Every structure is written in structure tokens, then in C-alpha cells.
Amino acid sequence: MTDTATSAGKIQPRLKQKYKTEIAANLSKDFGFTNVHQVPGLVKIVVNMGMGEAARDGKVIDGAINDLTLITGQKPQVTKARKSIAQFKLREGQPIGAHVTLRGDRMWEFLDRLLSLALPRIRDFRGLSDKQFDGNGNYTFGLTEQSMFHEINQDRIDRVRGMDITVVTTAKNDEEGRALLKQLGFPFRSVEAAS
């Protein structure tokens, strides 16, 4: 960090500080890494809302964009259909969803809010499945509704919208990715509870 950033009092996100001070050292010790660049870290978080109903009703996409903006603090990119499919009444170029890619401090702050505020608010939440890794240490999970985020006003929800959240890491395999996310505080379901 530069001297100007330090003197201006730039505050690092809580989870990022924890990663730099504790988690990186723990992972380095657990896996026997000799180089700091071998230690897995976070690259980006992608939050995606697919809105199939947007093909029939154009106003649906506006609600999704508004919700994603409130949740992530960043304007979403509108996803458009790549090709026309007659059975789904879908035309090429029609908006069918929205997604946000978070990097840097915004990513760390979103992850902190997700883990400490949003996930505990889910009714009957028993933890996330640890089987949703892609083989390269990246983790994807879905949320069924947007109301668990504090930023969303419960009274102004026009319809329930689910979302997919992908956490992209620099881990080489699922074992490293799982260890990183567990140390960051991801509430994975225990093996006994799953069976």
C-alpha cells in the first residue's frame, strides 16, 4: 500500500485483513507451500440472476437489475440471449438475466456481508453443500430468494428472485479451495448432517 493510501486512512475489509494475517499462513502450513504465490486466494465473485420470465415481460429485468445493484453495490451487466429458441419464445438479443462481477475490496465486503448477515437469515439453513466445487477450486451455490440480504426492503419485493453465486479462487484443486473457503468462514454442511 502506498504512503498516501495509508495517510488517508484507507480501511481494509475485515475478511481481507483476516486472510492476510491468519488464513494465508494457516493454508501455507497445512499444504506445505514454500512460495507465497502458491497459497490459494480469491480472484472474483460473480452474482448471476437468470430471469427466464423476462422473455415474456420486459419489466422483470428492471427489478432484477435494481435488486442486484442494492445487494452488490455495483451496476449489473444485462445478459442477452445468444440465439433464438422458438419453444421458449426467445429471440436473439433479448435480455434474459443480469450478472455482477465483484473484485478487490467490494468482493471482500460482499463476502463478509454474505457470510455474517445473509446466510444466517435463511430459514432452516443447515449449511452449504461442499460437493459443488468444479474441480479447479471454484465454488458455486444458489440462493432461492433475495430477501435474506439486509439491503433489500421486504415490503418492496415485487417477486421472489433467486441467484447463483460463484466464488473463483486461485486454488489448483477442490481440496485447496475447500480449505480456503472453510477458513474464510463458509458454513459447509458436516458429513454426519448430510447423511
Curated annotation (Swiss-Prot):
<keyword id="KW-0689">Ribosomal protein</keyword>
<dbReference type="InterPro" id="IPR020930">
    <property type="entry name" value="Ribosomal_uL5_bac-type"/>
</dbReference>
<dbReference type="Pfam" id="PF00281">
    <property type="entry name" value="Ribosomal_L5"/>
</dbReference>
<keyword id="KW-0687">Ribonucleoprotein</keyword>
<dbReference type="GO" id="GO:0000049">
    <property type="term" value="F:tRNA binding"/>
</dbReference>
<dbReference type="Pfam" id="PF00673">
    <property type="entry name" value="Ribosomal_L5_C"/>
</dbReference>
<keyword id="KW-0699">rRNA-binding</keyword>
<protein>
    <recommendedName>
        <fullName>Large ribosomal subunit protein uL5</fullName>
    </recommendedName>
</protein>
<dbReference type="InterPro" id="IPR031309">
    <property type="entry name" value="Ribosomal_uL5_C"/>
</dbReference>
<dbReference type="InterPro" id="IPR022803">
    <property type="entry name" value="Ribosomal_uL5_dom_sf"/>
</dbReference>
<comment type="subunit">
    <text>Part of the 50S ribosomal subunit; part of the 5S rRNA/L5/L18/L25 subcomplex. Contacts the 5S rRNA and the P site tRNA. Forms a bridge to the 30S subunit in the 70S ribosome.</text>
</comment>
<dbReference type="GO" id="GO:0003735">
    <property type="term" value="F:structural constituent of ribosome"/>
</dbReference>
<dbReference type="GO" id="GO:1990904">
    <property type="term" value="C:ribonucleoprotein complex"/>
</dbReference>
<dbReference type="InterPro" id="IPR002132">
    <property type="entry name" value="Ribosomal_uL5"/>
</dbReference>
<keyword id="KW-0694">RNA-binding</keyword>
<keyword id="KW-0820">tRNA-binding</keyword>
<dbReference type="InterPro" id="IPR031310">
    <property type="entry name" value="Ribosomal_uL5_N"/>
</dbReference>
<dbReference type="GO" id="GO:0005840">
    <property type="term" value="C:ribosome"/>
</dbReference>
<dbReference type="GO" id="GO:0019843">
    <property type="term" value="F:rRNA binding"/>
</dbReference>
<dbReference type="GO" id="GO:0006412">
    <property type="term" value="P:translation"/>
</dbReference>
<comment type="similarity">
    <text>Belongs to the universal ribosomal protein uL5 family.</text>
</comment>
<comment type="function">
    <text>This is one of the proteins that bind and probably mediate the attachment of the 5S RNA into the large ribosomal subunit, where it forms part of the central protuberance. In the 70S ribosome it contacts protein S13 of the 30S subunit (bridge B1b), connecting the 2 subunits; this bridge is implicated in subunit movement. Contacts the P site tRNA; the 5S rRNA and some of its associated proteins might help stabilize positioning of ribosome-bound tRNAs.</text>
</comment>
